[in-house]
């Protein structure tokens, strides 16, 4: 007998606003999910804020339509669909929710609340792994 993965369906009414937004993107970006890396990989990480001089606007709304949140929001290259969860060495788990003009290849931007945090972070090569 083949084991089939059990799938849990969460009623839409119980989903958070963010999860509803990401569910819409999941359908549109379904073709990307099968090509995600399964092994750890090196990212060239930098940090950004929601300041108008960095993003062209200051409302904190990401390309996926979700409001930025520190210790959660990543700007990822287009190869990573919105909602992809990525564990980053020494930093924790994040979710791809945004894009950026310079975010291509192995570059990832980590959202931080303040410019001083972002400048202090600088640019680092870190090990990352897709966890969903």
Go through each PLM region and give its residues.
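Solvent-exposed, well-ordered loop and adjacent helix/strand elements within mature globular domains
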Residues: 1-132
């Amino acid at each position: 007998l083949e084991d089939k993965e059990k799938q849990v369906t969460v009623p839409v009414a119980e989903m958070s606003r963010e999860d509803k937004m990401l569910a819409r993107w999941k359908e549109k970006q379904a073709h990307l999910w099968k090509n995600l890396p399964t092994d750890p990989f090196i990212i060239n990480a930098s940090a950004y804020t929601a300041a108008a001089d960095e993003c062209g606007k200051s409302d904190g709304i990401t390309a996926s339509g979700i409001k930025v949140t520190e210790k959660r929001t990543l700007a990822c290259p287009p190869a990573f669909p919105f909602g992809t969860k990525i564990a980053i060495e020494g930093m924790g788990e994040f979710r791809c929710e945004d894009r950026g003009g310079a975010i291509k290849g192995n570059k990832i931007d980590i959202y931080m609340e303040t410019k001083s945090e972002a400048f202090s972070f600088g640019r680092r090569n870190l090990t990352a792994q897709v966890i969903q």
